[in-house]
Each structure stands twice: as structure tokens, then as C-alpha cells.
């Protein structure tokens, strides 16, 4: 930039981007020119993704899990730009944006953070794009709620749902839908591997399997989907093929890197993720950092940092510090990742968690999960507002239902 004030440009308002921006706003720039910190995201709201399931069951409301960026950043000194990132010009250190109001423009940077996240892979499967529904964004949750409402209002005896993918998202979503639909639901998880939650601790996997069984949710392992229509899915188990009638297909199969990240003129791994060093700098670029789903991050010990919310949480402190160090002439710190365990929601009245020597399931785990995530909300103001709402909502519901 020609301006004496350096600019830090953060692309992506997910966990990695937003929390890095907030942390940068908290650091002291005494004795140095304070930078301009700009956060860019194409949506107007941050999404606390672990609670997206609670939106479907109406345990939580949109404002709780998806507060507007302008509210979260109001007292941080961080500037928010709602725009789509279309390209990055590394030679001239500019980000090209498509702004709904301003059209195409560029944004110069001195320090850059690439935290654009990932997307659900959509293979060339017959019927998937027309009849499959993803579950990653706020818009996906709204579409699912609308579809469920339509199915619930119809006079069909059963509501048949196929969930493709037996990872965290598929299992948590199945359990929540099982509780919402009750006896009327006919839910099936389709997993091509030998078991669901293949990366989970054994305790979590066993508790999840027991919960799904108790809710009457079927699990088909070593099974692939070969076609989807408006009324059925075709499944292949070894050499056998079956056609199963369905009302709704939910696609929750993994994460892939966005085409924008994949096409950047930067070092990538075989999955298209940006290669970074332990300081979270993109290889060969001292002023460009990457974290989250779009980056292959390794900590000081060489341990691969998982592309989860927990991994992003821990990366953001180091990312913010190292940008600050770049601009103030301090030494950069290598990231140190500490696995803290795993939590899964298993319906509206239970969960499971394990980590740091603790194993917990049922309502106690559900409460612990909520409190841990409440603590992880972006700002203390949002923590306070949501926490008070959780405390007072039961009283409000009771008063609403109390006979006059």
C-alpha cells in the first residue's frame, strides 16, 4: 500500500478468519502505526457451525448461532466488507472483490490471511444436484426446515430421509431429525466405509451407535449411492443393488477445497490445500497466512492440525500474533496444537464427549457441550446475550403455556 498505515486483509469470516480478526483488534500497537484490519466475507453473518443442527430442531434461533458481522465487530476496530473474493493478485498485493453494491474492485494488502473455508464435494452423481440437499450453510438449514415443514404437513404416514455420509455431520443431523420426527421418521444413514464416525474415539462411536439404534435410525455401511431421483435412491452394497423410496436426501459427505484456493499460484498439497509452515505462513510467502479447511497446517512438532472448528480456534491466536510480529519486528511463534477431545450432539436430549481423560454421555454431556461452545462464542457480549436467553427461555415457555 502507498498509505503509511499497513492493511491486514482477512479473507473468510468463519472460525479462522473472524477469530483472527478479533484477536488482532485486541493486540497493542503502541510504538507502531496501527494497521487497518479488514475482514471480507460474501455473507453478512458469522455461522457458529456446531449449533447448526439446533436450528433445525428449533432449540436455537438464527440470531444465537449466526450473529451479523457488524454486531460482532462493532467495538473491535475491524472493518467488515461483504463481498465475494474472485481472485488474488500476489504480484501487486491486491485482492479482487465482487461487491453487490460497488461491483468489481480491488483491495490492497500488506498482510493477508486466507481463511476461505471449504465446501461439500458434489461428485458427478445422477440426480445429486437436482435432488440432494447439503448441510453446511445457514441457507442449507433454512431449506431443510422448509422441506421438513412441507413433509410434516402432508398426510403421508412416514417421512423417509436418506442421509449420505456417516461422519460427524451425518450422525449429528440424523440424531436431531430422529428426535424432531419421532415415530413418523424413517431415517437411514448411508456410509461407504466399514463404520460410522471412523475418526472418532471408540467411546463416542459406541454411544452414537446406541443412540441411533434407540431412535430407530438405520445405518447402512459399505454402501454407496449410485443415483438419486425425486422419489428414491439407488444403493449398492457389494454386488447387490437396491432402490429405496425416499422423500428427502441429505448429502453430508466430507469437505473439499474451493476452486478459488485450488487455483491460486501458491504451493498446494494433493488435496488442493495451501501448504503452510508451523508459523501458518504459506510456503515461500512471509506476509501471507492460511488456516482452516483450505490449508494443510502442521504445528511445531510436525503434527497435522485437523480442519475442524477446534483446530481453527487454536490456529487463530498464533496467526494473529505472527501478523503482529511481522509488523512490529518481533519473532514469530510456531503453532502448537493440543487435541482437547471431541463432542457430538446426539439428539435434543443427549450428547457424548471424550477428551482430557473425561468421558461423558447423555444430558450431562449435552449441557457440557453447550457451555463449552458458549464460552467459544466470538465476543463476551454475544456470550452474555445468548447465555441469558438460555436461562430465561424455559420460564418464558412455561408462562406462555400456563393456562390463563
Curated annotation (Swiss-Prot):
UniProt xrefs under Gene3D superfamilies: 3.50.50.100
EC number(s) recorded for this UniProt protein: 1.6.5.12
Regulation: Inhibited by dicumarol.
Cofactor binding, note field: Binds 1 FAD per subunit.
Origin: domain of life: Bacteria
One Pfam family cited in the UniProt record for this chain: Pyr_redox_2
Enzymatic class: oxidoreductase
Alphabetical GO biological process terms: aerobic electron transport chain; phylloquinone biosynthetic process
Sample GO molecular function, one term: NAD(P)H dehydrogenase (quinone) activity
Catalytic activity from the UniProt record: demethylphylloquinone + NADPH + H(+) = demethylphylloquinol + NADP(+)
Disrupted gene: phenotype observed: Increased photosensitivity to high light.
Annotated keywords: FAD, Flavoprotein, NADP, Oxidoreductase
Cited PANTHER family: ALTERNATIVE NAD(P)H-UBIQUINONE OXIDOREDUCTASE C1, CHLOROPLASTIC_MITOCHONDRIAL (PTHR42913:SF4), APOPTOSIS-INDUCING FACTOR 1 (PTHR42913)
Function statement: Bifunctional oxidoreductase probably ables to act both on prenyl naphthoquinones and on prenyl benzoquinones. Catalyzes the penultimate step in the biosynthesis of vitamin K1.
Family: Belongs to the NADH dehydrogenase family.
Protein name as catalogued: Demethylphylloquinone reductase NdbB
Organism (species): Synechocystis sp. (strain ATCC 27184 / PCC 6803 / Kazusa)
Gene label: ndbB
Amino acid at each position: 500500500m502507498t498509505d503509511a498505515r499497513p492493511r491486514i486483509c482477512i479473507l473468510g469470516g468463519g472460525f479462522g478468519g473472524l477469530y483472527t480478526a478479533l484477536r488482532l483488534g485486541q493486540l497493542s500497537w503502541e510504538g507502531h502505526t496501527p494497521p487497518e484490519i479488514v475482514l471480507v466475507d460474501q455473507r453478512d453473518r458469522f455461522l457458529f457451525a456446531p449449533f447448526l443442527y439446533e436450528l433445525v430442531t428449533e432449540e436455537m434461533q438464527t440470531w444465537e448461532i449466526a450473529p451479523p458481522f457488524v454486531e460482532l465487530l462493532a467495538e473491535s476496530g475491524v472493518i467488515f466488507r461483504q463481498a465475494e473474493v474472485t481472485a488474488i493478485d500476489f504480484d501487486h498485493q491486491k485482492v479482487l472483490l465482487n461487491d453487490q453494491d460497488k461491483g468489481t474492485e480491488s483491495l490492497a494488502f500488506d498482510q493477508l490471511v486466507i481463511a476461505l473455508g471449504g465446501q461439500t464435494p458434489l461428485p458427478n452423481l445422477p440426480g445429486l444436484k437436482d435432488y440432494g440437499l447439503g448441510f453446511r450453510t445457514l441457507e442449507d438449514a433454512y431449506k431443510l426446515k422448509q422441506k421438513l415443514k412441507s413433509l410434516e404437513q402432508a398426510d403421508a404416514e412416514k417421512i423417509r430421509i436418506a442421509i449420505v455420509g456417516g461422519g460427524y455431520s451425518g450422525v449429528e443431523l440424523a440424531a436431531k431429525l430422529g428426535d424432531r420426527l419421532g415415530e413418523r421418521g424413517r431415517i437411514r444413514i448411508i456410509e461407504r466405509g466399514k463404520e460410522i464416525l471412523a475418526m472418532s474415539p471408540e467411546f463416542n462411536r459406541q454411544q452414537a451407535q446406541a443412540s441411533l439404534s434407540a431412535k430407530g435410525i438405520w445405518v447402512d455401511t459399505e454402501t454407496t449411492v449410485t443415483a438419486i431421483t425425486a422419489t428414491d435412491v439407488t444403493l449398492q452394497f457389494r454386488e447387490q443393488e437396491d432402490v429405496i423410496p425416499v422423500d428427502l436426501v441429505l448429502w453430508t459427505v466430507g469437505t473439499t477445497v474451493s476452486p478459488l484456493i485450488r487455483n491460486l499460484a501458491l504451493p498446494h498439497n494433493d488435496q488442493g490445500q495451501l501448504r503452510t509452515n508451523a508459523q501458518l505462513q504459506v510456503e515461500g510467502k512471509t506476509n501471507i497466512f492460511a488456516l482452516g479447511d483450505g490449508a494443510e497446517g502442521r504445528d511445531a512438532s510436525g503434527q497435522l492440525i485437523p480442519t475442524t472448528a477446534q483446530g481453527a480456534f487454536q490456529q487463530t491466536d498464533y496467526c494473529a500474533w505472527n501478523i503482529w510480529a511481522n509488523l512490529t519486528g518481533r519473532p514469530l511463534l510456531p503453532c502448537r496444537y493440543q487435541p482437547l477431545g471431541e463432542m457430538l450432539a446426539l439428539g435434543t436430549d443427549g450428547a457424548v464427549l471424550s477428551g482430557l481423560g473425561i468421558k461423558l454421555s447423555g444430558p450431562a454431556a449435552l449441557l457440557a457441550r453447550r457451555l463449552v461452545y458458549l464460552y467459544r462464542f466470538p465476543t463476551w457480549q454475544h456470550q452474555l446475550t445468548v447465555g441469558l436467553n438460555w436461562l430465561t427461555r424455559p420460564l418464558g415457555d412455561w408462562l406462555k403455556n400456563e393456562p390463563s
